[in-house]
Amino acid sequence: MEPLDALEKHGDIKKVLTEKLATLPTSPGIYQFKNSAGRIIYVGKAKNLRNRVRSYFRNSHQLFGKTLVLVSHIDDLEVIITSSEVEALILENNLIKELKPRYNVNLKDDKTYPYLVITNEPYPRILFTRHRRNDGSIAFGPYTEARQLRSILDLIGSIFPVRSCKLRLTPDAIASGKYKVCLDYHIHKCKGACEGLQPEDEYRQMIDEIIKLLKGKTSALIRSLTENMHLAATELRFEQAAEIKAQIESLKRYAERQKVVAADMVDRDVFAIAAGEDDACGVIFKIREGKLLGSQRIYINNTNGESEASMQLRMLEKFYVESIEPVPDEILLQEALSEEEEETLRAFLLVKAKNEGQEKKGIRLVVPQIGDKAHLVGMCRQNARHHLEEYLIQKQKRGEAAREHFGLTALKELLHLPTLPQRIECFDNSHFQGTDYVSSMVCFEKGKTKKSDYRKFKIKTFEGSDDYAAMDEVLRRRYSGSLTESLALPDLIVVDGGKGQVNTAYKTLQELGVTIPVIGLAKRIEEIFTPHSSDPFNLPKTSPALKLLQQLRDEAHRFAITYHRKLRSDRTLQTELTTIAGIGEKTAFKLLEHFGSVESVAQASREELQAVIGAKAGETVYTFYRPEG
């Protein structure tokens, strides 16, 4: 996957999206793109939210037509995590039909996913339908594929002798003898209920078994079918075995049926909470007519060890006081309320419903432990955890930004700078007994590192140890010539050192005609030096200005030490190779650059060495490490 810092380089990605892209989960779910007005302009589903959403921006140069226009209007995004891609597909369909986003074109039609319905009759039928009934019939679904639903109907028909006729089998009609059995009875697909050959209670018992099957209690049935499949294969009835295998696969697919949409058509809210040390996030799923139409979030701060049950009650009260949505028939909760709390909340909701013209006899408050309702609460809690994590990351970044701003403001006031030091450059020297003398320059912009503007210098104008001369050389190279043209000038220069370093830096800058404030920060006791000041001054250890200066100084020191160690390592490694007759520094460097270490050079074959440095030199190095020939 392309890293986030690469995504940030694309010009078409807004800054507000960058942080959200960094926290996207890899779970399945739906994503909603919003425009600058906060309006949802597109809803999509994904098996992996992180990969799918990032693909819009990673490959933006390859987009065309409406998709390109869509991306140009994206200002924000929200996600809802689901348990499977199938759930995401159902939720996507529901949201598109409800919200009608501008850039959704594929699911705006009125096509409805099919349901399996058990009719409300003395001898119920099992039907395929795309329209829900409100006559007491029992519905299961929806199904994303009509083919899958038809295979389940075939499966049920192959296991249970359910009637397929459209006859109105009332007790009087059956008793009158007006109906006769059809072919299904003779091929054992029906038990002749139309002629009274199957009692109603026996038929009802069979329907109850089918309902159990449709509710997911399929393990025993699968075991039975598997035994039948093996028996058929053993008896060489391969066609029948294949049919049974297909039935098992259909049954297994059904076991993974959709749970986002509840079949009972009840209007309900689902509430769950996720809590951190000091913050908590509550998520409310809004389910209307069995469809999950969206979610809302509530955050509370400074929880101070408050229980999740207590926070849940606070959030529920806040949500329903402010909500303009109709009061649902049922609320699924993560934590149980006390009897008094439950009665208070229920009474408030009933009054609210009455004031809004709703007629409700009662409102169910349920803490489900198993089944589809528990699944909904679990999915809601998973979303709460995700949003809390995202919130805490944003909170941390806001805190860091505040500290950085305080640090810059404190520096401006402390040093009497004309403007806020948005860009600061810091220099540090490093050497070992006068050898491999180097210097580093690091850059902070708005209190954060800007590594693309880091520079490292190898001292060229003298040999030995002279920190002042090194500082003079580095500042001249930085603030004159090509670097002055390629890099913006800073608002403040910081050098690692005391009075001598600061005065040297000031003198060099004066000679170059550079009027940028410069200060020094000495190690150990953290004294701050300014040019021409006889005495340094100290800042409190908790000062945001001091912390920012320490970050700068430590980063410059780290960068210088890293470069210095690399030079020493390269020089040390080249020493052994350059002792080989006929091998100079350039050849040694080529070997190290290709093989990575002296050990790898020593173990290389003759052919490998010759491919890098030529036949003669390769033979020389190969023979050096294998004197025996």
From Swiss-Prot:
Residues 219-254 form the UVR domain. Residues 26-105 form the GIY-YIG domain. GO terms for molecular function: DNA binding; excinuclease ABC activity. GO terms for biological process: nucleotide-excision repair; SOS response. It is found in: Cytoplasm. It comes from the Bacteria. Keywords: Cytoplasm, DNA damage, DNA excision, DNA repair, Excision nuclease, SOS response. GO terms for cellular component: cytoplasm; excinuclease repair complex. Belongs to the UvrC family. Interacts with UvrB in an incision complex. The UvrABC repair system catalyzes the recognition and processing of DNA lesions. UvrC both incises the 5' and 3' sides of the lesion. The N-terminal half is responsible for the 3' incision and the C-terminal half is responsible for the 5' incision. This is UvrABC system protein C. It comes from Chlorobium chlorochromatii (strain CaD3).
